[in-house]
Amino acid sequence: MFSKILTKVIGSRNDRTLRKLRKIVDQINKLEPQFESLQDEELKAKTIEFRARLEQGEDLDNLLPEAFATVREASKRLYGMRHFDVQMIGGMVLNDSQIAEMRTGEGKTLTATLPCYLNALTGKGVHVVTVNDYLAKRDAETNRELFEFLGMTVGVNVPNMPPQEKKQAYLCDILYGTNNEFGFDYLRDNMAFRAEDRVQRERYFAVVDEVDSILIDEARTPLIISGPAEDSSELYIRINTLIPQLVKQDEEDSEEYRGEGHYTLDEKGKQTHLTENGQEFVEQLLKDAGLMEEDDTLYSPANISLLHHINAALRAHVLFEKDVDYIVKDDEVIIVDEHTGRTMPGRRWSEGLHQAVEAKEGVKIQNENQTLASITFQNFFRLYEKLSGMTGTADTEAFEFQSIYGLDTVVIPTNRPMARNDMGDLVYMTEAEKFAAIIEDIKGCSERGQPVLVGTVSIEKSELLSNALKKAKIKHNVLNAKFHEQEADIVANAGTASAVTIATNMAGRGTDIVLGGSWQADVAKLSDPTEEQIQAVKAKWKEAHDAVLASGGLHIIGTERHESRRIDNQLRGRAGRQGDAGSSRFYLSMEDALMRIFASDRVSGMMKKLGMEEGEAIEHPWVTKAIENAQRKVEGRNFDIRKQLLEYDDVANDQRKVVYELRDELMNVDDISEMIGYNRQEVLEGLFGQYIPPQSLEEMWDVEGLTTRLRADFDLDLPLQEWLDNDDKLHEDNLREKIIEAAVQVYKEKEESVGESVLRNFEKAVMLQTLDGLWKEHLAAMDHLRQGIHLRGYAQKNPKQEYKRESFELFEGLLDTLKFDVVSILSKVRVQQQEDVERMEEQRRLQAEEAARRQQLQHQNAENQLDDGEGAEEAHSPMVREERKVGRNEPCPCGSGKKYKQCHGKI
């Protein structure tokens, strides 16, 4: 009560914001006569002046009144369109990184030109994000003349553009494109191998059109780039035939038989290592099999992949036993958990080991799709320094915009008062009765020349209604979201007298329905029209426009309520643009999905008590209230799901940032020798600690084991025991230092023999290639972890905390493995000359091109991302419970760890 009184006295937050912005609008309006007096060249020169002032340190907000006045004046001269004061307010809201809720027909496209121009003055680039390619191209072409007049460059970012064109587009001052394409470009840039292959620059300012659709409706669906894991089935099979010829080195008499065995075993670490003799023997086998050139060696840079396959096959044969480590069932290798003895279907060993075991057992080698990169829209758009958005319906989701993105919502008043008549809902017992009433309503409108837009929740329902209209001999158009270009034409003419248009909920967004039709479309049909012809078309349109207004304007019919009130408001918002007359009504039945699940008992009980006849409807504020409460429940549930997805993705996002920053650093420097040196020291110290524990007695040292590992992993043949025997003063610390010094010296000799620049290039290539391979495997491991983490709730553990803890352990493992593998490869691989590095680079480039050709870009269904059993927000799929009902005292399926009655059972 008190808060209501306070709001009346001082106004709401929205009112206070508008009052503050109106003062700036007054300043802009005072500048108008001054800007009207400028010549075209003087107006164009304003851009150069503003940029110079910014370079001298002037604040962007100080330039706002003059910049907005410049854009308004240019628009008046080029298009004959003057920005309304409310559009100026909308532009300021967008510039302040907020969401502007502007009703349909209030000119969002023109409003966006104001903050786009202002922020493009910085030279950092502005991205205008739309829901489809058609709107991106249309808006870019609509505003191109205005921006180019003011000295700005305009680009369009659409799928399948050549990389060079895309790179040029990103250099434009203002770039229009879809949310998917901006997101995929970001992921592709972070998979590039050379700095010049990247297309994006910094993410500075984004204006998201239809922001509710992009940041809320699509927020549960991550962007994923996936591709088939490297298809080397044939190579696994061929190498599998070579491995049985290898002989294990005799352990007991290793000194005596050294050189005769081909490999050594480390059963504790589940690793194998080729001996020097083994390496030569394998090289000969590979040459005989035609897998390696005659003058080549196993450790040359181009053969890193071959070495990887040999190691995997050797481990599969000598360390992994059938019916101990795995079983073969239904032509598939299934891992056995070493701790529990249970099988783990769906899990696969990494680093090619699983494929090697499949080759060994003669079953089909599976090359499953692998996630190469992924990100959610929440985390992608939060990368922008400034983010803003506009839509006709944001206020119902204001809390989510604020809590997830930190964006406040400002409701912009309409330029003219709203004149639309929103009538109460009519509820029928059956769908057949409801459709019959809709047909009658459409007939009545057609007879008096009133255009009708019918909104359906799915293509299936729109086809049902279309068939009913055909039977009633009522001419109509059906809109679906498949063909955006035709869609715009149909929507543009949906306001002509007696027009009947059926559209699914999202179809036609972004195109205004003008009463009387679009005179611009009629002019476009004329070839080289004269001014006289244009005026005749306008006069004809004016007559049609006035006739439609007299019939009551556009009438909106909703065939059922959507899960979200916001989608209902979007449908209503198609009518009553810019103060035009219009009306709306929703027709519901007890068979509708929303009514059946959430409101059926109460409302159907009320209808039965009233003793309703067939074809009779109920219209009461209580019914509308019950439906809105049901919608609030669904909105709350969907918000919880999006929030939960974000909490999980935030964990992956922190790791993604670290990996992408490291990649960025590697791409932008030529010399990473300091990083390699630091890693070498860390890896060798870690290995030393495994065999010679800190502050331990010499009797506890495993000198022989350390000697073997140094030889096998780093090609370091060091006589450690001899050093210790000959020097009594040699203790733990200086032995460690001596090993590191020896490793540095060997590497220095390698550098002197091949040349510094050759080795620097090779270091960078190895680091990038190893990082990318491990990151792909890490993403797969994170997917596996996500899929089963909700089960921790049954063990009274918090799944989110467990996910954070285990994913951190996985990531630490990735970083440790990266350091170890890079140091090991650089120590063992023999680089002869620059050609070796170029061969490796060429091989990698060809693989990357092939992978890019086979890549799949997915805007993945959220159902695969969440383990809470909740379905995706798709209006056309009826909400039917497929799984058994969750008991009140059982753990909640959302994975919170709470009981169902204390979590989602409350809703």
UniProtKB/Swiss-Prot annotation:
It comes from the Bacteria. It is an enzyme of class 7 (translocase). Its EC number is 7.4.2.8. Keywords: ATP-binding, Cell inner membrane, Cell membrane, Cytoplasm, Membrane, Metal-binding, Nucleotide-binding, Protein transport, Translocase, Translocation, Transport, Zinc. May bind 1 zinc ion per subunit. The keyword Mitochondrion does not apply. GO terms for biological process: intracellular protein transmembrane transport; protein import; protein targeting; protein transport by the Sec complex. HAMAP family: SecA (MF_01382). PANTHER family: CHLOROPLAST PROTEIN-TRANSPORTING ATPASE, SECA INNER MEMBRANE COMPONENT OF SEC PROTEIN SECRETION SYSTEM. Part of the Sec protein translocase complex. Interacts with the SecYEG preprotein conducting channel. Has a central role in coupling the hydrolysis of ATP to the transfer of proteins into and across the cell membrane, serving both as a receptor for the preprotein-SecB complex and as an ATP-driven molecular motor driving the stepwise translocation of polypeptide chains across the membrane. This is Protein translocase subunit SecA. The lineage of its organism: Bacteria, Pseudomonadati, Pseudomonadota, Gammaproteobacteria, Vibrionales.
